[in-house]
Amino acid sequence: MPEPRGSSQLRVNAAFAARYNRYREREELQRLKDRYGDRDSSSDSSSESDSSDERVEFDPQQERDFYKTLSLLKKKDPRIYQKDATFYNRTASSSDSEEDPEALEKQKKVRPMYLKDYERKVILEKAGKYVDEENSDGETSNHRLQETSSQSYVEEQKQLKESFRAFVEDSEDEDGAGEGGSSLLQKRAKTRQEKAQEEADYIEWLKGQKEIRNPDSLKELTHLKEYWNDPELDEGERFLRDYILNKRYEEEEEEEEDEEEMEEEEGVHGPPVQLAVDDSSDEGELFLKKQEDFEQKYNFRFEEPDSASVKTYPRSIASSVRRKDERRKEKREETRERKKREKAKKQEELKQLKNLKRKEILAKLEKLRKVTGNEMLGLEEGDLEDDFDPAQHDQLMQKCFGDEYYGAVEEEKPQFEEEEGLEDDWNWDTWDGPEQEGDWSQQELHCEDPNFNMDADYDPSQPRKKKREAPLTGKKKRKSPFAAAVGQEKPVFEPGDKTFEEYLDEYYRLDYEDIIDDLPCRFKYRTVVPCDFGLSTEEILAADDKELNRWCSLKKTCMYRSEQEELRDKRAYSQKAQNSWKKRQVFKSLCREEAETPAEATGKPQRDEAGPQRQLPALDGSLMGPESPPAQEEEAPVSPHKKPAPQKRRRAKKARLLGPTVMLGGCEFSRQRLQAFGLNPKRLHFRQLGRQRRKQQGPKNSS
């Protein structure tokens, strides 16, 4: 059930009531000021406002006294328990300013001198008489001369001594006199920047971030510094240290002032309200305006504030600018440099290996020269330093180990001097090599062995006599030089040694084009079957390119094929080249050159009795018919009254092979060939017919 209306209590907003009362007091004060005027001086009001607005600043000497007292407390010094002990002293600057009025005058700003001030000074000091500086200097100098001339020498010396004594006394009393002492030497006052720098160094020294040159004056604060810089300092003491040294109490004061300003702004919106209100209606309007503002804030408290205004935020360059990230690029460059170094190292190792292999080959070559007895073997050191060339390698091997090397035969029979005491009647079929001297102590025969010598005078250490067959005749023959050469000891062949060609192949195999993944990559060469396609070198050089292409296309010559396919093509083209008639049909330029050779020698075309049936020289030098195939070598004799039948057959066969032809430059070309070159064969054919008609009509017109 709802509660009765009488039991409900009325609650009053205390903060709003206090602000309203303060507002009413200001309003009443403003109304009285407007009516009776402001009786107080403006200076007092300004001083009060300044004193209220200005922030309380701590004296640096007071801060040092505070740190000194805190250090004594942390150290638990016995002086803190004394009753008469004082830890805070009044600063010299404040005491001097309060006691000495002259210090207050010096602190005031120096008033600039205007023209009126200068005129007033002249009237008061010089009785209104303006005197130039030059004249005044002259007057003072004349006055001094008059004084010196009136004084005697003793008086002058006495005056100088007194002035010197006064100067010495002033210099001795300078430290104690302070500002009232001699004006010759004055203590320089520190500037504001120097004082601020000293305070900053002092704070950094307490933080342990900097050292001070004269730490004697801060000897009492050493314990506080060590206490605050202890790494095991607890959290509370660390917070107190940071709060005092970083002056965070000033930040709190600024925050409080900002909060007060925000409250004042929130309390009153719009233009400032005049406090001077003469009528009560104005008070009601102001109250209603505040009420409306409060209702609007309460009703729209869940909406976005300041939705009607477009907010703009300044750009923070440090956070908005994109930082240049080149870590991946640097990583790639490092990887590239590392691979480059590894590649250079690998190349150096391969180069060293190649040099060692070259030395080994040169040693093998020197040994080969000694064995063969050929000092000019045909292979020099420069041949090994060049790049590998397969054709040059084959020529080099053919030059060194060709047929001349293996098939060399001595032209003259060698003559050997016969030596006495040697017999040449030996049966070399039963010769079993040179007899080696055995060590009888290592392998001694037993008396029961079948080969045991029963002779008592037998000495195993002596060389055994050579076995020989009895000569057929009773004469004693000498040993031939061949027998002496065969009987010499020969080096045993080592099957593990490589041939010289294998050494060269292994040396050239060390060359490479590039190194990929620590592996030297090189082109692989293979041995192909040599094939001339049934043509000689002269025919290949003298023939036209188109004729060579008709005989064998360039695509087929450069095709990569297996060895069986190359052998098959070699046999096919060798058989194709044996057909001389077909060869002449393809290589017409070669046949024409051979046919024109005798005509150029005599100056007249050579024709036989048959006329058109002239013989054309073949490619191999033999004379054959111009168009007859090789199968029709024997022809029947042709009667002089009838045209020979084989000539018609030859023309018909030629027409079937080439089709309708056109003569151009003394050569016959088929229409398909002219069309392949982009020419119009019909037009050329009609031009040829027109020329023939004009030639035929020429003799008729002349007759």
From Swiss-Prot:
Biological processes, Gene Ontology terms: endonucleolytic cleavage in ITS1 to separate SSU-rRNA from 5.8S rRNA and LSU-rRNA from tricistronic rRNA transcript (SSU-rRNA, 5.8S rRNA, LSU-rRNA)
Keyword annotations of the record: Phosphoprotein
InterPro entries recorded: Kri1, Kri1-like_C
Record-level GO cellular component terms: 90S preribosome; nucleolus
Pfam family, one: Kri1_C
Bias type Acidic residues, positions: 251-266, 417-438
Residues carrying Phosphothreonine: 91
One example GO MF annotation: RNA binding
Bias type Basic residues, positions: 463-480, 640-656
Residues bearing the modification Phosphoserine: 93-95, 97, 136, 141, 163, 171, 280-281, 309, 622, 628, 639
Segments for region (Disordered): 27-63, 83-111, 127-193, 249-284, 305-351, 412-490, 594-665
UniProt superkingdom: Eukaryota
Record's compositionally biased regions (Basic and acidic residues): 27-42, 52-63, 155-168, 322-337
Family note: Belongs to the KRI1 family.
Protein name: Protein KRI1 homolog
Organism: Homo sapiens (Human)
